[in-house]
């Protein structure tokens, strides 16, 4: 279900104004199965109901329209294999499809789909090695580039690709990339990321050099970069015994630190960062808490009111 909050508010409502709607089926305006994005005054999503389709809707959740059917992956027997990862970027849906691994020459299919016309282009066909499977994590998009892992070639490490979304070609491969490294963010052709066991790093593409900006010997870190801040959720080891949330400004000055406690069985996950809040979940999906970014010197988890308890009439 799609939920929304008014600007400056942390109270979420179901995006549906149908009278007496129970918000529990595909007939609800807010119903959406996978993927969600915004572009040029419309909302977009992907539905798996009967057809594998990209849909467009108005900002109030009404007038659902099919833009196009997403490319289907079929095995040697012609059976359909649907699903994958979905990223909305600058008027396009970037779709990393599940390859049919029963095919001996399978490789990861990557598509660029124009949101308003449905025009579809397959990317990186000439560059992605055979037997490249769908990456469950480590994928990011920024500044016109897709970053994603390639098949592992050595113990604990895997090549990491930088693909140009305009040309459809892979331009760079980081050969020595640990699975525990964070995803990459590209600002003005400088790459930002956390390297496991090393710290927060910058990579100058023009010079081909990496600089460690904040040395940090932690096992793993989720990172969220904004125009003004950097937020990290660090884990001390593979046992996940200690989890710390750190806030820095873009000059790498530490602004705040919070030792997280488990909520249920897990430490909270970083999910979304906006101008008004850093949102966290306890299951890697459902937002349950937020942090006020205006008080980073005293980081505090604030629990959201259950968004499923209300609807917008």
Where are these regions (language model features)?
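Loop/turn-rich, solvent-exposed surfaces of beta-rich toroidal or solenoidal domains
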Residues: 218-243
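C-terminal regulatory/effector modules of DNA-binding transcriptional regulators
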Residues: 95, 137-139, 148, 159, ...
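Residue position within the beta-strands of beta-propeller blades
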Residues: 1, 44-46, 94-97, 147-149, ...
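Catalytic-core helical/loop segments in enzymes performing group transfer/polymerization on anionic/lipid-linked
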Residues: 95, 232, 248, 264-269
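Repeated scaffold domains used in trafficking and secretory/extracellular systems
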Residues: 24-38, 73-90, 128-143, 175-188, ...
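Surface-exposed loop/turn elements that mediate protein-protein interactions on large endomembrane-trafficking
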Residues: 2-23, 51-74, 105-129, 154-176, ...
């Amino acid at each position: 279900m799609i939920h929304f909050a008014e600007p400056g508010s942390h109270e979420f409502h179901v995006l549906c104004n149908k009278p007496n709607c129970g918000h529990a089926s595909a007939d609800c305006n807010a119903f959406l199965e996978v993927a969600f994005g915004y572009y040029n005054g419309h909302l977009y999503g992907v539905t798996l109901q009967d057809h594998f389709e990209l849909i467009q809707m108005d900002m109030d959740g009404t007038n659902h329209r099919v833009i196009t059917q997403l490319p289907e992956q079929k095995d040697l027997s012609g059976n359909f294999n649907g699903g994958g990862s979905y990223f909305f970027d600058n008027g396009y849906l970037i779709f990393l499809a599940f390859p049919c691994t029963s095919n001996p020459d399978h490789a990861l299919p990557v598509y660029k789909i124009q949101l308003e016309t449905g025009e579809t282009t397959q990317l990186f066909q000439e560059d992605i090695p055979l037997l490249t499977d769908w990456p469950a994590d480590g994928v990011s998009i920024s500044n016109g580039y897709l970053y994603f892992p390639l098949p592992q070639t050595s113990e604990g490490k895997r090549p990491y690709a930088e693909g140009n979304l305009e040309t459809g070609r892979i331009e760079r491969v980081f050969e020595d990339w640990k699975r525990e490294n964070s995803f990459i963010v590209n600002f003005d052709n400088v790459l930002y990321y956390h390297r496991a066991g090393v710290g927060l790093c910058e990579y100058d593409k023009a010079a081909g050099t990496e600089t460690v900006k904040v040395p940090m010997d932690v096992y793993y870190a989720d990172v969220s970069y904004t125009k003004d801040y950097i937020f990290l959720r660090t884990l001390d080891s593979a046992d996940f015994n200690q989890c710390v949330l750190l806030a820095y400004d873009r000059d790498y000055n530490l602004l705040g630190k919070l030792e997280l406690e488990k909520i249920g069985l897990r430490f909270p996950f970083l999910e979304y960062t906006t101008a008004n809040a850093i949102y966290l979940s306890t299951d890697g999906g459902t937002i349950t808490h937020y942090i006020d970014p205006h008080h980073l010197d005293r980081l505090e988890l604030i629990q959201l009111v259950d968004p499923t308890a209300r609807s917008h009439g």
